[in-house]
Amino acid sequence: MQLWQKQLNLFFIAMGFFTRIPMPKWIEVDADKLNKASRYFGLVGLLVGAISAAVYSLMLYWVSPSVAIVFAMITSVLVTGGFHEDGLADTADGLGGGWTVEAKLNIMKDSRLGSYGALALVLALLLKWQLLTELALFDPSSVSLALIVGHCLSRVVAASFIFSEEYVSDTDTSKSKPLAQQQGINELSILLASGVLALLLVGLVPALVLITGLVIVRYGFIRLFRSQIGGYTGDTLGAAQQGSELSCYLLLLILGVSW
């Protein structure tokens, strides 16, 4: 298999793991490839953002921007299966309801939704809709840009934890086993390159502001997760992705960035 075929294979594995989009039948999957596929987390975000932006732009022909945003949000959840929202809810339940590290990790593994998780989900979705609606008031086209950039950069931030933090859950039973293995500089370079692609859409100054803001957000999440559970789990990566996505929308709104 040639180099480009190997990379395409890894991208489709990442797409199949992080979304509900089916992989082509010719894709070769094994444990090693599954671990290396995290390098394309950002590109998968670009894809999810582009699909959501396309639905938003299409719906603008028939409904108001605020309603079109709801359809875009529904689309992203359908495409990903609520993968990251589930992580946010589990993280909120675990950190909010557990008194010890072991208790927090056990609560995160519980698929049932608790009060902390429900509150986190509702507040995150409301804030996401409100931020995007405010962007639409400034310029309806800016929402499409925000969706693409936000979905990509937030996944770059979340996946970057794999390269610097310790995985603290049981790798044998975890549903996020591909996120548990630390990767090398090649994987990190490809991950960051996908973030650069998104930043090219916003211009130099907004890009620098986004980088600075997301570095601060990442640091905050790292401090939180280290103090609470000593590292990260797949669920906390979902929480970091959702928090970073909301941060992107907030920063783009403050900057007033549009196409």
Swiss-Prot record:
E.C. code: 2.7.8.26
Topology of the protein relative to the lipid bilayer: Multi-pass membrane protein
GO annotation, biological process: cobalamin biosynthetic process
Reactions it catalyzes: alpha-ribazole + adenosylcob(III)inamide-GDP = adenosylcob(III)alamin + GMP + H(+); alpha-ribazole 5'-phosphate + adenosylcob(III)inamide-GDP = adenosylcob(III)alamin 5'-phosphate + GMP + H(+)
Major location (coarse): membrane
Keyword Membrane tagged: yes
GO cellular component: plasma membrane
A Pfam entry, by short name: CobS
GO molecular function, one term: cobalamin 5'-phosphate synthase activity
InterPro entries: CobS
Compartments where located: Cell inner membrane
Keyword terms, alphabetized: Cell inner membrane, Cell membrane, Cobalamin biosynthesis, Magnesium, Membrane, Transferase, Transmembrane, Transmembrane helix
Pathway the protein contributes to: Cofactor biosynthesis; adenosylcobalamin biosynthesis; adenosylcobalamin from cob(II)yrinate a,c-diamide: step 7/7
Residue spans crossing the bilayer: 9-29, 43-63, 64-84, 118-138, 143-163, 196-216
Function: Joins adenosylcobinamide-GDP and alpha-ribazole to generate adenosylcobalamin (Ado-cobalamin). Also synthesizes adenosylcobalamin 5'-phosphate from adenosylcobinamide-GDP and alpha-ribazole 5'-phosphate.
Similarity-based family: Belongs to the CobS family.
PANTHER family in UniProt: ADENOSYLCOBINAMIDE-GDP RIBAZOLETRANSFERASE
Protein name from the UniProt record: Adenosylcobinamide-GDP ribazoletransferase
Organism: Shewanella halifaxensis (strain HAW-EB4)
Gene name, Swiss-Prot/TrEMBL: cobS
